[in-house]
Amino acid sequence: MKQIDLKILDKRIGTEFPLPTYATTGSAGLDLRALIEQPLTVEAGQTVLIPTGISVYIADPNLAAVILPRSGLGHKNGIVLGNLIGLIDSDYQGPLMVSLWNRSDKPFTVEVGDRIAQLVFVPVVQAQFNIVEEFTATDRGEGGFGHSGKQ
């Protein structure tokens, strides 16, 4: 298992709230919690920035992390990430914050310690461009949105 440096910024982690962990051996994401001081109501259409109480330093340029929404929050409550996805570069060392957007028509209350997002580590390839006049032909070619059909 890859070792990643994690800094605890909120002293409630490890006492009141657990360190981020994988729920099962097959889990891809670690749950991130709302480390707020008191419950926070997110009004319909509002976006808020919520601290997670941690920072990570990935260090390995072949890795990055992404902050992704939790499916239940979006499907059941209309709570999604304000920036749709958060990208954490390997050299970033600051606090992990979660932008929550209430896309529903009802207020939603985030409780202290609620699991609000998940953190997934992903491989990174930095590309070097090769300038060409033409691409090698493929069956798809320039076919874009909807090109491959519905069924």
UniProtKB/Swiss-Prot annotation:
Substrate binds at residues 70-72, 83, 87-89, 97. GO terms for biological process: dUMP biosynthetic process; dUTP catabolic process. Transmembrane segments: none annotated. The keyword Magnesium applies. It catalyses: dUTP + H2O = dUMP + diphosphate + H(+). Its EC number is 3.6.1.23. It comes from the Bacteria. Its cofactor is Mg(2+). Keywords: Hydrolase, Magnesium, Metal-binding, Nucleotide metabolism. Pathway: Pyrimidine metabolism; dUMP biosynthesis; dUMP from dCTP (dUTP route): step 2/2. One of its GO terms (molecular function) is magnesium ion binding. The keyword Metal-binding applies. This enzyme is involved in nucleotide metabolism: it produces dUMP, the immediate precursor of thymidine nucleotides and it decreases the intracellular concentration of dUTP so that uracil cannot be incorporated into DNA. Belongs to the dUTPase family. NCBIfam families: dut, PRK00601.1. This is Deoxyuridine 5'-triphosphate nucleotidohydrolase.
